[in-house]
């Protein structure tokens, strides 16, 4: 069936509305899981300087994440305007954090980039590079912090300190292997399910690691500020890294419950009180997840309304 066929156009409209309704339903379900009275009480009681600093770092983090797609723009060689790339990246990241990688990382990227005129093969390369960049920074930081023994694990926990150090060494070996391939591999092209991927240069790989590592460190700094700076920053960052991989394994949208469980298990007691941890993470979820998601929803609707005009402009420029 031709893409210009009336039935095809109708099917696309129906699917778009079904997707939009599904997003609204997921938002409502997520909102019901949050104790909003406690959230606003926590925010009202926060030190204003710490809260404003945290808000500023949230903005910085989302801007840094936008650089992942700018790296992908350079990697793929597509000509979409940088502001369009940053906007799509912001929308996708906000949806990805709260509604899973399938919705934000994959679904939204394919939807928006295709609406702006990019072919599916290019979008696949953008997504692949973006997710690789994100986890390269994670692997590098986690490797350093786990190997250094910064995270103090309780005796009753699932893994011991030695296992975590071995894991850290393994992660650093992954980084070393990736850099070696980027620097010395002779065969730099690979095809995965019909999609051609090209191994980047070692300088590009270093840029991926640097940008992503800074983003993870900014995320850790947000929680550290909201905890009142009462705990060592690198310990907080290490706990965030542990909770992030736990969230991926459990695979719950927004890691609801996982983030809190890991932070309470590793921080509560001699480091800080359970109430302080819960309050900080409630504020973190509002600032880093929920408010950006609401803004992203508005941006998504605006971008959808302008997509046809922007696509025509992009195709003329290409």
From Swiss-Prot:
Residues 35-50, 107-125, 187-205, 299-318 are cytoplasmic. It is a multi-pass membrane protein. Coiled coil: none annotated. It is found in: Cell inner membrane. To Synechocystis PCC 6803 slr0712. Residues 1-13, 72-85, 147-165, 227-233, 276-277 are periplasmic. Its main location: membrane. GO terms for cellular component: plasma membrane. This is Inner membrane protein YbhN. Keywords: Cell inner membrane, Cell membrane, Membrane, Transmembrane, Transmembrane helix. The chain crosses the membrane at residues 14-34, 51-71, 86-106, 126-146, 166-186, 206-226, 234-254, 255-275, 278-298.
């Amino acid at each position: 069936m031709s893409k210009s066929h009336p039935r095809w156009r109708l099917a696309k409209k129906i699917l778009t509305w079904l997707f939009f309704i599904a997003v609204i339903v997921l938002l409502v379900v997520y909102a019901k899981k949050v104790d909003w009275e406690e959230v606003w009480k926590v925010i009202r009681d926060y030190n204003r300087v710490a809260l404003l600093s945290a808000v500023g770092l949230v903005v910085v983090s989302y801007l840094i994440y936008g650089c992942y797609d700018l790296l992908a723009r350079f990697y793929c060689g597509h000509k979409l305007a940088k502001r369009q790339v940053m906007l799509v990246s912001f929308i996708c990241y906000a949806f990805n954090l709260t509604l899973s990688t399938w919705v934000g990382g994959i679904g939204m990227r394919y939807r928006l980039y295709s609406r702006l005129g990019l072919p599916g093969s290019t979008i696949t390369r953008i997504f692949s590079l973006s997710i690789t960049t994100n986890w390269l920074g994670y692997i590098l930081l986690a490797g350093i912090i786990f190997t250094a023994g910064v995270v103090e694990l309780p005796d009753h926990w699932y893994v011991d300190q030695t296992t975590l150090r071995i894991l850290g060494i393994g992660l650093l070996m992954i980084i070393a292997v990736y850099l070696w391939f980027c620097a010395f591999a002779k065969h730099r092209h690979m095809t995965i399910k019909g999609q051609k991927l090209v191994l980047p240069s070692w300088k590009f790989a270093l840029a991926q690691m640097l940008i992503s590592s800074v983003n993870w460190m900014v995320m850790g700094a947000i929680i550290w500020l909201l905890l009142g700076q009462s705990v060592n920053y690198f310990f907080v960052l290490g706990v965030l890294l542990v909770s992030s991989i736990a969230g991926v394994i459990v695979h719950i949208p927004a890691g609801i419950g996982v983030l809190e469980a890991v932070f309470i298990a590793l921080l509560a007691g001699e480091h800080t009180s359970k109430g302080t941890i819960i309050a900080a993470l409630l504020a973190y979820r509002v600032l880093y997840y929920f408010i950006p998601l609401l803004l992203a929803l508005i941006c998504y609707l605006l971008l959808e309304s302008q997509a046809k005009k922007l696509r025509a402009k992009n195709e003329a420029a290409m």
